[in-house]
Every structure is written in C-alpha cells, then in structure tokens.
Amino acid sequence: PDIMTSAKALGCGVPVGAFAATKEVADAMCPGDHGTTYGGNPLATAAVCKVFEIFEKDNILGHVNEIAPYLSEKLNELKDKFPDKIKDVRGKGLMMGMELYGQAGDVVSQMLKKGVVLISAGTSIIRFVPPLVVEKEHIDIMCEKLEEIFGA
C-alpha cells in the first residue's frame, strides 16, 4: 500500500497512532499536511519502542505466521462440518471472519456464557481477532465450544 496506518496495538494500551508511506507519497507531503492526536509524545514513543523490542525478542510475528494458518484451518473445518450454519470463512492472518446463515449475535452470546469472548461484525458475521500470543490449545478450546453450539 502507499500509506499504512496503525494504532491501538502499536502502544500496547498506551494511546498512540502512526502512519508510514512510500517514498513517493512522503516526498509529496509538506509540513502541516498531516496532523495527529496521538503521535510523537515521549510516553507513547517509549511505549512503541518497548513493544517493538518485545516483538523482536519474543518473535511475535514469527508466532503469528505459524499460528494463523491453524486458526484458518480450524474455522474451515467447522465450515465443512456445519455447511447449513456456516456460509463462509475468510480473513487474513489472525483477523478472521465467519459468515453465518443465522444471527452472529446469538452465537456470540452463547460463547460468552461458555467463557469465550467474540464479537460480531454486522448481523451475520463473527469476527475472530485473538491476541497475537494465542496458542493452538486456545483455538482448539474455542472451536470445541463453537462445535457444541453449532451441533445443538
């Protein structure tokens, strides 16, 4: 992309925002073309530096690249098992969506009662955005609980 924005996770809870641009786009910008509410203060900058340090030290992105295909595989297994309830599974990395034929809110509510927090996106899509440190066992537990709901 020509411009990429990031916030929220960038400071791991400390309000901060940032954007990166290609050289061509950056060269076309002048001072004052872009303003920021959460950029550049010393606390936020220190938080971002620490987050980057931890990401590198703990190989967070390597872990995400290993675990994301597993999440996709497990969600698609559910789709194959319940084709009358799950219309589609799509997404990239650890940001996945499951489109249902029914109401996503019903499944989200039932999952909360089972101890798993999910969110819906619209009326028929469950959004999956686990923490970047999610493990296979967490995905398995979530999928087992989804299977209980879809199989009921």
Predicted regions and their residues:
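Conserved N-terminal phosphate-binding loop of PLP-dependent enzymes in the Aspartate aminotransferase
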Residues: 1-152
